[in-house]
């Protein structure tokens, strides 16, 4: 009897993981079936930007805001990369993607004001509140996990630090979805962190254990201190979060190869309603034209892990010059892979970009009025842009 139960449980587990296990074979670099539906595309600022995981579009201004962290090559809490030595920090940038007018095409770093820990700034998710011109940024600082809050002057392109948000439930924050100027959901991508329990974190990832969390936070409107905090959902590898509509929250489940859809209850609790199964591992989710999910992620987990572990060698000329022949060959032969798809209730899932010309895709954004799209890469140089 016990053996029967064990076999049944194992069969159920393997079935639930079959599409992810299949991706290890079907999406390997030599087998990945590539596609690119974008005709007029360009990688911009490859000589100035690297490792820009997330971005937001301010469509009325035709302005993209992104955070780029070259230090991710040596410090990645999610993937367990910890290389000793000097660690560069992240910066905030504004890209004016207009095709005409003052400043069109310019990339400008924000001047950071009043941020005492600016050298310990290692960014992941971004969320912007237009009503108060406030930017929320998840920060995997060496000093501990936190959310940084900045007031932006979009004319002067300054970012004045307003607060650092910490809380016992903010353990490994990844993505943010605002519900108002002082209310938000935050995803914690793991329960076990690679800093404190590397083996357990790896087991949690590869078995897709539903231990990661989505936390609801209510903040004080004057100083952003936490008034209330509670876990409202648990799932495997909670990554990007986005409101599909007023009553539905989408949460990427990276290690499960899926996006979970939740009903948002009146008290901000979440009730799981359905799962979107994917042929790749999703990173971030965004909304296109108010009704379609843009899902961005990684085709092949083993390749992504290898790519992440090699960046501190491949992107540092001095280290690369002193590297072994094997390491240099790895840098030349290890591609970054990307997968972008869109999903809607009406049309289902449709892949729109499966490529290695721009790798490690993490976020895709679309401004339909301007006919402008952008992909940001977790471990890539520059921003992939296209126009229609």
How does the language model describe each region?
Residues 11-20, 279-351:
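Loop/turn-rich, solvent-exposed surfaces of beta-rich toroidal or solenoidal domains
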Residues 49-58, 115-130, 166-183, 191, ...:
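Beta-rich, blade/repeat-based domains predominating
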Residues 70-135, 139:
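Blade-loop segments of beta-propeller domains
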Residues 301, 361-388:
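Blade-level signature of beta-propeller repeat domains, shared across WD40, Kelch, NHL, RCC1
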């Amino acid at each position: 009897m016990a053996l029967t139960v064990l076999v049944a449980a194992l069969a159920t587990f393997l079935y639930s993981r079959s599409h992810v296990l299949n991706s290890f074979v079907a999406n390997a670099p030599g087998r990945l079936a590539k596609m690119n539906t974008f005709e007029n595309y360009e990688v911009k600022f490859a000589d100035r930007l690297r490792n820009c995981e997330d971005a937001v579009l301010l469509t009325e201004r035709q302005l993209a805001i992104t955070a780029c962290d070259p230090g991710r090559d040596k410090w990645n809490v999610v993937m367990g990369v910890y290389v000793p030595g000097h660690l560069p920090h992240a910066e905030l940038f504004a890209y004016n993607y207009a095709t005409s007018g003052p400043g069109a095409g310019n990339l400008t770093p924000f001047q950071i004001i009043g941020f005492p820990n600016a050298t310990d700034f290692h960014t992941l998710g971004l969320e912007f509140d237009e009503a108060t011109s406030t930017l929320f940024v998840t920060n995997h600082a060496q000093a501990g996990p936190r959310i940084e809050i900045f007031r932006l002057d979009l004319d002067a392109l300054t970012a004045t630090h307003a607060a650092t948000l910490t809380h016992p439930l903010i353990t490994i924050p990844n993505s943010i979805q605002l519900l108002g100027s002082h209310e938000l959901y935050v995803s914690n991508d793991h329960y076990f962190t690679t800093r404190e329990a590397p083996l357990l974190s790896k087991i949690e990832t590869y078995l897709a254990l539903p231990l990661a969390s989505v936390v609801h936070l209510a903040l004080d409107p004057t100083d952003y201190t936490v008034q209330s905090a509670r876990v409202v959902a648990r799932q495997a590898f909670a990554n990007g979060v986005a409101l599909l509509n007023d009553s539905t929250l989408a949460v990427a489940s990276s290690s499960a190869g899926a996006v979970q859809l939740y009903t948002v209850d009146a008290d901000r609790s979440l009730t799981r309603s359905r799962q979107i199964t994917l042929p790749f591992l999703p990173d971030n989710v965004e909304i296109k034209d108010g009704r379609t999910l843009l899902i961005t992620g990684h085709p092949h987990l083993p390749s992504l892990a290898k790519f992440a572990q090699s960046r501190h060698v491949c992107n540092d000329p001095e280290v690369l010059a002193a590297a072994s022949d094997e390491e240099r060959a790895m840098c030349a032969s290890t591609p970054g892979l990307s997968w972008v798809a869109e999903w809607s209730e009406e049309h289902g899932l449709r892949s729109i970009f499966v490529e290695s010309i721009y790798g490690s895709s993490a976020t895709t954004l679309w401004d339909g009025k301007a006919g402008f799209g952008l992909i940001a890469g977790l471990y890539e140089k520059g921003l992939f842009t296209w126009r229609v």
